[in-house]
Amino acid sequence: MKFAKGHGTENDFVLLCDTPAELRLTAAGVAALCDRRRGLGADGVLRVTTAGAAAAAGVLDRLPDGVAGDDWYMDYRNSDGSVAQMCGNGVRVFAHYLRASGLETRDEFVVGSLAGPRPVTVHAADATGADVSVDMGKANTLGSGGKAFEATVGGRRFAGLAVDVGNPHLACLDPELSVDELAALDVAAPVSFDAAQFPDGVNVEVLTAPAAGVVHMRVHERGVGETRSCGTGTVAAAVAALTAAGADTGTLTVRVPGGDVVVTVTDATSYLRGPSVLVAHGEISEEWWQQAQR
């Protein structure tokens, strides 16, 4: 079984090219593949297929709204094996892989996801690196029903803004938090939040106030833990930072441990632009894969 390994600002993925959607991706198999000691190691797995093939194979119950059968489809799994609606860094790496492998020749095309269609623009790409923009759709802030959204991260309580970017986020901007304090925060430790507000869990971002157009962010992703970057999380962070500044739209650089991305928020949608790197290509032992499914 062939694979590729890539990352977007060090949010890393194993890509499995499975255009007929025939692979059996169990939670156990995905978790083993993502394990950094007994597998290849990754924050998640990207199955490369089309929406029509995924629906025909039963991977999808139905085509997501706005996604056509002949659109590419990113079947994304978190490192614990759970299915995720969307991954902004993953879409960039997915699009880069399509171009680098010759499966796609266009500069602009659609990548489908459970969260819907994500139009991409490949500004530049070669076998190793790419610069990709993704139309992430409109990021919607969520009401709290009169109860504040809060999370505890690294033993510290933060107020946050709930943002839907195709998946749920709690973006916690602390105007008093310094870059050094953010770097010292234990984001890898389990986070706590009101499960009644987020019954399906939530991705939690902690960020500084913007300075010279730059926001510093760290993230604890549901189903994964701390990652070096989270594409949808950077969009949520940009929305929170703009909202705190009294703005509805704007462009910010979001600096995560894995690098920088640029997020633009408009009245109608949001855009995420950043790098992708393809690191390796290889083959997974069929015997190991079968054992990992158990």
From Swiss-Prot:
Record-level GO BP terms: lysine biosynthetic process via diaminopimelate
Give me the segments passing through the membrane.
none
One GO term of the cellular component aspect? Answer: cytosol
An example Gene Ontology molecular-function term: diaminopimelate epimerase activity
Q: Which SUPFAM superfamilies match?
A: Diaminopimelate epimerase-like (SSF54506)
Q: Where does the record place the catalytic residues?
A: C87, C230
Top EC class of this enzyme: isomerase
- Metabolic or biological pathway, per its Swiss-Prot or TrEMBL entry: Amino-acid biosynthesis; L-lysine biosynthesis via DAP pathway; DL-2,6-diaminopimelate from LL-2,6-diaminopimelate: step 1/1
* Domain of life according to the entry: Bacteria
* Location in the cell: Cytoplasm
**Keywords linked to the UniProt accession:** Amino-acid biosynthesis, Cytoplasm, Isomerase, Lysine biosynthesis
Name the Pfam families for this protein. DAP_epimerase (PF01678)
NCBIfam families for the chain: DapF
The record's function comment reads: Catalyzes the stereoinversion of LL-2,6-diaminopimelate (L,L-DAP) to meso-diaminopimelate (meso-DAP), a precursor of L-lysine and an essential component of the bacterial peptidoglycan.
**Family matches, as PANTHER family:** DIAMINOPIMELATE EPIMERASE, DIAMINOPIMELATE EPIMERASE, CHLOROPLASTIC
* The protein's name: Diaminopimelate epimerase
